[in-house]
Curated annotation (Swiss-Prot):
Keyword Ribosomal protein: no
Species in which this protein is naturally found: Arabidopsis thaliana
InterPro entries linked: Ataxin-3 (IPR033865), Josephin (IPR006155)
Chain ranges of the UIM domain: 243-262
Compartment(s): Nucleus
Lineage: Eukaryota, Viridiplantae, Streptophyta, Embryophyta, Tracheophyta
Cellular component terms per the entry's GO annotation: nucleus
PANTHER family xrefs: ATAXIN-3-RELATED (PTHR14159:SF0)
Stretch list, region Disordered: 183-240
Listed EC numbers: 3.4.19.12
Protein name: Ataxin-3 homolog
Amino acid sequence: MERTSNGGMLYHEVQESNLCAVHCVNTVLQGPFFSEFDLAAVAADLDGKERQVMLEGAAVGGFAPGDFLAEESHNVSLGGDFSIQVLQKALEVWDLQVIPLNCPDAEPAQIDPELESAFICHLHDHWFCIRKVNGEWYNFDSLLAAPQHLSKFYLSAFLDSLKGAGWSIFIVKGNFPQECPMSSSSEASNSFGQWLSPEDAERIRKNTSSGSSARNKRSNDNVNQQRRNQALSREEVQAFSEMEDDDLKAAIAASLLDASAAEANLGAVGTSEKETEKQK
């Protein structure tokens, strides 16, 4: 049976700027172990090693060293997004290994993800972690106000939906830290980390969902009212068009009637004139 860690509490970080990679690493470790400066240092170290390899290759291939020194970092973007290599190196400090879910070594996890302890998910510039804590699975996406509990059945469905949407998924393997002293964690959390009981996390999510539902209801009501107005406008236009058609038909009929009457009157006048001439 898995031992309860951190007194049964969940560690969650809410999105701050573009620091989702930092949030992802810390929620994998379940504690504020890394800051953005720590990951930036890891990225700089990787950049230095990569440039050294490129310089050595330049000497063999006849390229100028300046061709590579001007290269931008491939491990951290100007917006603060870190590469998977940075996350891998950071987790290696804790003797954890990161491997792609679609590689042959990960076949058991593909069949039964419940066997694992953590997944890292990445799409475009966003990272988040799915983690088993005290025997229960949670989605620690930093865009969420609190961790989202995932049932064992829903875990597989959720991972499949992410893969179908184009997300890259990695497994984290190794011996995860069991305890993170909360006294020191509050100092290192940079104000975006929080410890929550599973009950508190559920309560926060329900309150957030209720607020979102109310906003969505108001938005939907507005959309529905706009649609009703548009439908009413279309009906009015159609009725007006039909009215115009009826009026046009009536006007044409009246015009034809007037023309017939005029012709009849004209014919009567002509006949009367002829009879007058005969009498003369």
